[in-house]
Amino acid sequence: MKALVLNALGRRFEFEDVEIASPEGREVLVDVQASGLCHTDLLFATHDIAPTPSVLGHEVAGIVAAIGHDVTQVRVGDHVVGSLAQACGGCARCLSGRPFQCQHPEATLRRPDDAPRLSRDGTGLFQGFGLGGFAERALIHENQLAVVPKAMPFAQAALLGCGVVTGAGAVLNTANV
């Protein structure tokens, strides 16, 4: 499949052929329909924040194409939007309604000794925020997805994952509006 890969800091993104694994456990394979370019993606591309090579893109929306055997929150055919919150769903903070303060966000990723979700020529690619939406498909933990109405346009849905929640969080939690 094609993905927009950042190979080194300060370089341009490049369209490349990459491999994507089959979904395991609580992973969901999403056919990406829209992905926004956020300023955070540009910061990742120009500052030493995340490893390269990487597939960024955290404002992502698409259609569920396949699910791992333990997935319970989405079904094939659902329209979904990705979330920045990498939350395990089982720690005290997640269970008290604070998934953004999850104590075990690594639970949404594959273990280092597992095969990578994304790879190129056998080498794993970093998946920005566990999403990697700058690709034709993305393999994402179910806790990082929210189902949206099928009538919602994908371009608008993609904005929900970062821009809208960031703005709403500032208005509701900081400005107390």
What are the roles of these predicted feature ranges?
Residues 1-2:
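Extreme N-terminal starter segment of soluble prokaryotic enzymes
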Residues 5, 20, 44, 139-140, ...:
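Conserved hydrophobic "DFG−1" position in protein kinase catalytic cores
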Residues 11-15, 39-40:
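Short N-terminal binding/cap micro-motifs at the start of the first secondary-structure element
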Residues 19-20, 51-57, 125-130, 136-137:
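Short Gly/Pro-enriched turn/cap motifs at secondary-structure boundaries
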Residues 21-35, 45-95, 100, 147-151:
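Glycine-rich beta-strand-centered segment in the early N-terminal region that forms part
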Residues 39, 58, 169:
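Histidine-centered active-site/metal-ligand motif
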Residues 88-177:
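NAD(P)H dinucleotide-binding glycine-rich loop of Rossmann-like/cofactor-binding domains
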